[in-house]
Amino acid sequence: MEDFVRQCFNPMIVELAEKTMKEYGEDPKIETNKFAAICTHLEVCFMYSDFHFIDERGESIIVESGDPNALLKHRFEIIEGRDRAMAWTVVNSICNTTGVDKPKFLPDLYDYKENRFTEIGVTRREIHIYYLEKANKIKSEKTHIHIFSFTGEEMATKADYTLDEESRARIKTRLFTIRQEMASRGLWDSFRQSERGEETIEERFEITGTMRRLADQSLPPNFSSLENFRAYVDGFKPNGCIEGKLSQMSKEVNARIEPFLKTTPRPLRLPDGPPCSQRSKFLLMDALKLSIEDPSHEGEGIPLYDAIKCMKTFFGWREPNIIKPHEKGINPNYLMAWKQVLAELQDIENEDKIPKTKNMKKTSQLMWALGENMAPEKVDFEDCKDIDDLKQYHSDEPELRSLASWIQSEFNKACELTDSSWIELDEIGEDVAPIEHIASMRRNYFTAEVSHCRATEYIMKGVYINTALLNASCAAMDDFQLIPMISKCRTKEGRRKTNLYGFIIKGRSHLRNDTDVVNFVSMEFSLTDPRLEPHKWEKYCVLEIGEMLLRTAIGQVSRPMFLYVRTNGTSKIKMKWGMEMRRCLLQSLQQIESMIEAESSIKEKDMTKEFFENRSETWPIGESPKGVEEGSIGKVCRTLLAKSVFNSLYSSPQLEGFSAESRKLLLIVQALRDNLEPGTFDLEGLYGAIEECLINDPWVLLNASWFNSFLTHALR
C-alpha cells in the first residue's frame, strides 16, 4: 500500500500526509491504510478548491487557465494540510475579519463566497452514516458538510453541493480511479474494511461500563440506545433518500433505484443478418509470405529491391484468373491491375539500375480502383447557402451483420506462437533513468513470452505498412506509388529473414487534414481458398495466381496460391496510430505488471520470478461458453497482447462506444460479486446504449459474445 500511495499521489500531497501523521505520532510505513486515507482526503480538498475564484464584482467564477494578472481571489482558503498551529492561526484570522463563529474543530476549507467553513469527508462506508457521524461530531449548523464516497455518491448539508457539477464529477472520477487502482492491486478490501470495521474484533465483544455510556451519549438525535441505532443502520434502505436528492436536482428526473441482483442482468442482444466480413487493412491469419533468409543482395534494406528478391524465390507463377469476384466492383480491373504490377516489376529488372521507388502508370484500371476523379466536387458553402432545398448528403443506415466464427479463429491464431522472433529485446525501449532491476527483469520475461507471438508479427507488419504509406503519401502526392508490404524477423537459429506479403498501390494523397483519406489498392498473397468462407471476403476480389509446393508429413503437395485484392482507404491520423502499434506491447506489459503487483502485495515480496517460472500454475485468460478459460502465464501475456493489437487493427466508433458503455455494466456486475449491493436506475437505457454499438463490426460482435459468456458465469 505504501508503494501505491507514493506512485498514485502527487509528491507534495504525500509529504503533507507524512507530516500530519508524524504530528500525531503515527508511522506511514505501519499504518498504510491511514496514510492512503489522509492522502485521498488532502487531494479531494485541493481539487475542491482548484480553479474556483472570485472576480472584482464578488462573483464566483471558474478559471482553468488564463491571464495570471487578472484581479482574482481564490474562492476557498485551504486549512487542511497545514500544521495545527498555523491552521488555527488561519482560522482565527478568518473569524476576526469576517465575523463568523469560531468552530470547535479544525475545518478543511473556508468558502469566501458563502462565508462559511466547510468540512470535507471522504468515506469508504455508507455515506449517510458517515454524514451523521460528522454532523454529530461538529454539532454546528454554521459549518457546511460535504461528503464524497468511493462509489460516486455525495451528500451535503441541506443538499447544497456548493460547486458546479463538473468540478464535483472530477472529484468523483478521481476517487473511483483510486478505488479501481487499489482493487487491481488487491488493496481495496483491506482499505475499505479499515474504516468500516465490519470484521473487527470489537463487534464480537459486549460493550459495558463507561464505553457503553459513552456510546449511548454519542448517538445521533432520536436514537435511545446503541442497539436501536444499529438496527436502523443495518436495515437502512437508501431508496427514498436518493430519489429525494434526484428530485431536488431536477423536476424532470424520476428515477427509482432498483436493487441489482444475480437475476437482474440479461444477455446482450447480438444483431441478426448476414455474417460479418473481414475489414482489417491487411490480411492476418490468411497472409502468405515470400521470404529470403540472410539477405545480402545489392540494395538490401531498400523495400523495392527486397520485394523483387522475394518475388524471385517463387517459381510457381501461373496466368492469373478470377475465382471469387467482388460483387459490386469491376473485377477485370483488379485482374489487370495485378498483371500491370507483374509487368512493371519485370520492366524494372530490365533497366540498368533498379530505382528506389516505383510509380505505376496511371492506367484506366488503376484510376478506377483508386477512385480517381470519383470524388464529388467541393463547393464553398458561401456559394450555395441560398439554395432552398440544400440538405445533407443522404447515406443509408449500415446493414446489420451477425457474428461469424472466423473472427474467433483470427483471435485464437493471433495468440499462437510462430517459429520466428518479431522483436528484439530492446523493442519496448530502455528507460532513460537507470532502470530498476525488477522492472528490467519483468520486461525481459515478458518479451521472451511475446517475441514469437503472431500478434507481435501483426504489430511489426502494421508499423511497416503504415510508415511506408504515410511516407509515400507525403513524398509522392500525385503518384500511384507501388509500396511492397514487408516485415523482418529472425529464425529460431537467429538468422535474419525478410518477408514479402504483397503490394499496395497508393492513390492521390493531398492530405491537408488529419481525416483526409488516401485510397489504396492492396494485393496480398494467400493459400486460403476464399470459397470456404465467402462471407469473410465480401470486400475482396480474389485471383488464383500460381501453385506452391508445400512440404508435409506425406511429402510434397501442390496448393493453389491466391491473391486477395481490394480497394481500401486510410487517413493521416489512422496511419499515425498504425505507426505507433508498438504501444500495444507496453499496454499488455502494464496489465501483466498489475497482476504481478497484486500477487506481490499478498505475499509481501516481489513475485516476478515465481510468476513467470512456475510453469505448473494456471491463470484465468477469459470467458468462453465452457466457462473460465485458464492457461500458462505466457498464454496470458499473449492473449492480453492480442486483445490490445485487435483493438488497434479493428478500431472504430462502434468499439469506442461498446467499450465505454459495457464497462459501466461490467462495474455493476463486479460490485455485485464484491457484495457491495449495487442499485441501478434505467438499466434498460444502459443496455440500449451498449446494443446500439452492435451493428456489423466483427471485433465488437466477438467482444459482445465474450461479455455474454462473462455474465453467464459471473452470476452463477
Swiss-Prot record:
Where Mn(2+) 2 binds, per the record, is at 80, 108
Any Pfam family hit: Flu_PA
For this chain the motif Nuclear localization signal 1 (NLS1) maps to 124-139
Cofactor: record remark: Binds 2 manganese ions per subunit.
The EC class name is: hydrolase
Q: What is its EC number?
A: 3.1.-.-
How is the polypeptide modified once translated?
Phosphorylated on serines and threonines by host kinases, including human casein kinase II.
Motif Nuclear localization signal 2 (NLS2), which positions?
A: 184-247
A Gene Ontology cellular-component term:
host cell nucleus
**Where primarily located?**
host cell
- Gene Ontology biological process terms in this record: cap snatching; DNA-templated transcription; symbiont-mediated suppression of host gene expression; symbiont-mediated suppression of host mRNA transcription via inhibition of RNA polymerase II activity; viral RNA genome replication; viral translational frameshifting
* Gene3D superfamilies listed in its UniProt record: Influenza RNA-dependent RNA polymerase subunit PA, endonuclease domain (3.40.91.90)
Keywords, ordered alphabetically: Cap snatching, Endonuclease, Eukaryotic host gene expression shutoff by virus, Eukaryotic host transcription shutoff by virus, Host cytoplasm, Host gene expression shutoff by virus, Host nucleus, Host-virus interaction, Hydrolase, Inhibition of host RNA polymerase II by virus, Manganese, Metal-binding, Nuclease, Phosphoprotein
What are the recorded GO MF terms, alphabetically? endonuclease activity; metal ion binding; RNA binding
**What cofactor is this protein dependent on?**
Mn(2+)
Q: Which cysteines are joined by disulfide bonds?
A: none
InterPro entries (alphabetical)? INFV_PA, PA/PA-X, PA/PA-X_sf
Location in or out of the cell: Host cytoplasm; Host nucleus
Residues recorded as binding Mn(2+) 1, renumbered to this chain, are: 41, 108, 119-120
- What family name appears in the similarity comment? Belongs to the influenza viruses PA family.
The record describes its quaternary structure and partners as:
Influenza RNA polymerase is composed of three subunits: PB1, PB2 and PA. Interacts (via C-terminus) with PB1 (via N-terminus).
Name the UniProt record assigns to this protein:
Polymerase acidic protein
Q: Give the species this sequence originates from.
A: Influenza A virus (strain A/Chicken/Hong Kong/220/1997 H5N1 genotype Gs/Gd)
